[in-house]
């Protein structure tokens, strides 16, 4: 064991960083690649914001879904069935 400079932070010690970069793979080897991989992949802990998935848009030529929606009867609005009070 080689001596470590006590002024260095623990995460900057030699040998603390893996020689290969982290990947998006979730196999057992990659899950135990480093501490960050273990926490995020093996334990599933992430503190970042979750990205919202964008819906797939239909091609420009297909408007059939919108047409079929307009043919359906409109549902009554929820709320007071007697109407607005004045």
Swiss-Prot record:
GO annotation, biological process: DNA-templated transcription; positive regulation of transcription elongation by RNA polymerase II; positive regulation of viral transcription; symbiont-mediated perturbation of host chromatin organization; symbiont-mediated suppression of host innate immune response; symbiont-mediated suppression of host translation initiation; symbiont-mediated suppression of host type I interferon-mediated signaling pathway
InterPro entries: IV_Tat (IPR001831), Tat_dom_sf (IPR036963)
PTM section of the record: Asymmetrical arginine methylation by host PRMT6 seems to diminish the transactivation capacity of Tat and affects the interaction with host CCNT1. Acetylation by EP300, CREBBP, GCN5L2/GCN5 and PCAF regulates the transactivation activity of Tat. EP300-mediated acetylation of Lys-50 promotes dissociation of Tat from the TAR RNA through the competitive binding to PCAF's bromodomain. In addition, the non-acetylated Tat's N-terminus can also interact with PCAF. PCAF-mediated acetylation of Lys-28 enhances Tat's binding to CCNT1. Lys-50 is deacetylated by SIRT1.
Asymmetric dimethylarginine PTM positions: 52-53
Ranges annotated as biased composition (Polar residues): 60-79
Comp. bias (Basic residues): 48-58
Cross-link Glycyl lysine isopeptide (Lys-Gly) (interchain with G-Cter in ubiquitin) placement: 71
Region (Core) residue spans: 38-48
Binding site for Zn(2+) 1: 22, 33-34, 37
Binding-site positions, Zn(2+) 2: 25, 27, 30
Predominant location: host cell
Region (Interaction with the host capping enzyme RNGTT): 49-86
UniProt short sequence motif Cell attachment site, positions renumbered to this chain: 78-80
Miscellaneous comment text of the record: This truncated variant has a premature stop codon. It may have arose as a consequence of tissue culture passaging. HIV-1 lineages are divided in three main groups, M (for Major), O (for Outlier), and N (for New, or Non-M, Non-O). The vast majority of strains found worldwide belong to the group M. Group O seems to be endemic to and largely confined to Cameroon and neighboring countries in West Central Africa, where these viruses represent a small minority of HIV-1 strains. The group N is represented by a limited number of isolates from Cameroonian persons. The group M is further subdivided in 9 clades or subtypes (A to D, F to H, J and K).
Subunit structure, interactors included: Interacts with host CCNT1. Associates with the P-TEFb complex composed at least of Tat, P-TEFb (CDK9 and CCNT1), TAR RNA, RNA Pol II. Recruits the HATs CREBBP, TAF1/TFIID, EP300, PCAF and GCN5L2. Interacts with host KAT5/Tip60; this interaction targets the latter to degradation. Interacts with the host deacetylase SIRT1. Interacts with host capping enzyme RNGTT; this interaction stimulates RNGTT. Binds to host KDR, and to the host integrins ITGAV/ITGB3 and ITGA5/ITGB1. Interacts with host KPNB1/importin beta-1 without previous binding to KPNA1/importin alpha-1. Interacts with EIF2AK2.
Family assignment from sequence similarity: Belongs to the lentiviruses Tat family.
Entry's free-text remark on domains: The cell attachment site mediates the interaction with ITGAV/ITGB3 and ITGA5/ITGB1 integrins, leading to vascular cell migration and invasion. This interaction also provides endothelial cells with the adhesion signal they require to grow in response to mitogens. The Cys-rich region may bind 2 zinc ions. This region is involved in binding to KAT5.
Protein name in the entry: Protein Tat
Organism of derivation: Human immunodeficiency virus type 1 group M subtype B (isolate PCV12) (HIV-1)
